[in-house]
């Protein structure tokens, strides 16, 4: 793990986030990520508070942007990048070292909501809304292949209490304790009707086995980076997109049975 960018591209967005909410409102999901917390004093303090003990290892000393650049150059044509958060680090990497773009085998995004409403705002999905300028840079980069795992597929697959219990079964005591301490674990313990989507896990599964995809469409994609009510919205153009946009595979459906079996396999 390497520490990376701690601010979105737009200047002072963190400081002015409260005003942004007043102006544009929010969606059905109240999660706002790092915008909802003060900046931590150190990663060591966060670790101690979260796990109640001293860290047993340290992050990679390289900045995440340099880590991406160096590893791609070291393994040309071999690496698939799983972009399962805001796109800030990857955006800076391709701006700093554009030579890595043709060396990346594939980029799989957990991000965007192309044909349905957003979650954190009525139009935008969280990861791309958090740093729309970075997301726009990355999706407009001419990678060999881009696969979009957005809300279009993720919100078809709720993680229910039954699936959670199946996932817990057979876990080592340490892992079980960790899972039960998470927000989802606490909610499942209180409410058997609770469910949650597994956005990032789904993107990781497709990275491991792209044949999970059973329905998709290929479109030119873009991100609205104009500051306003639709800031961060994912845009899909079945025919001709705006100049600079790139074609991407947008996942619509996957083999759910295979996915859930993959998640609980030992």
Go through the PLM ranges and name each one.
Residues 7-14, 37-156, 161:
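Active-site histidine-anchored catalytic micro-motif
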Residues 29-31, 37-40, 56, 232, ...:
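Intrinsically disordered, low-complexity, compositionally biased regions/tails
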Residues 28-32, 109-111, 134-137, 174-179:
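Short, surface-exposed, polar/charged, turn-prone segments marking secondary-structure boundaries
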Residues 1-36:
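Active-site rim/loop-helix segments in enzyme catalytic domains that contact anionic ligands
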Residues 1, 138, 204:
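A residue-level signal for conserved active-site and pocket-lining positions in enzyme catalytic cores
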Residues 129-133, 145-266:
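Conformational coupling and interaction surfaces
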């Amino acid at each position: 793990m390497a520490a990376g960018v701690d601010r979105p591209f737009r200047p002072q967005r963190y400081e002015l986030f409260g005003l942004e909410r007043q102006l544009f409102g929010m969606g059905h999901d109240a999660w706002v990520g790092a915008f909802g917390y003060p900046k931590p004093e150190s990663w060591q303090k966060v670790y101690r508070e979260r796990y109640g003990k001293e860290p047993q290892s340290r992050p990679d000393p390289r900045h995440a942007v340099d880590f991406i650049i160096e590893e791609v150059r070291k393994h040309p044509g071999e690496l698939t990048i799983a972009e399962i958060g805001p796109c800030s680090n990857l955006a800076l990497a391709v701006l700093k070292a554009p030579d890595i773009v043709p060396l990346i085998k594939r980029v799989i995004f957990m991000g965007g909501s192309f044909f349905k409403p957003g979650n954190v705002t009525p139009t935008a999905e969280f990861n791309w809304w958090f740093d729309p300028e970075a997301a726009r840079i990355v999706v407009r980069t001419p990678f060999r292949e881009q696969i979009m795992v957005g809300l279009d597929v993720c919100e078809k697959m709720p993680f229910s209490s039954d699936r959670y219990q199946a996932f817990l079964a057979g876990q080592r005591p340490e892992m079980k304790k960790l899972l039960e301490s998470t927000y989802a674990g606490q909610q499942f313990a209180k409410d058997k009707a609770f469910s949650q989507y597994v956005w990032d896990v789904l993107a990781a599964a497709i990275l491991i086995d792209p044949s999970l995809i059973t329905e998709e469409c290929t479109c030119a994609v873009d991100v609205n980076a104009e500051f306003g009510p639709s800031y961060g919205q994912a845009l899909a153009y079945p025919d001709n997109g705006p100049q600079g946009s790139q074609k991407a595979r947008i996942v619509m459906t996957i083999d759910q049975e295979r996915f859930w079996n993959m998640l609980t396999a030992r």
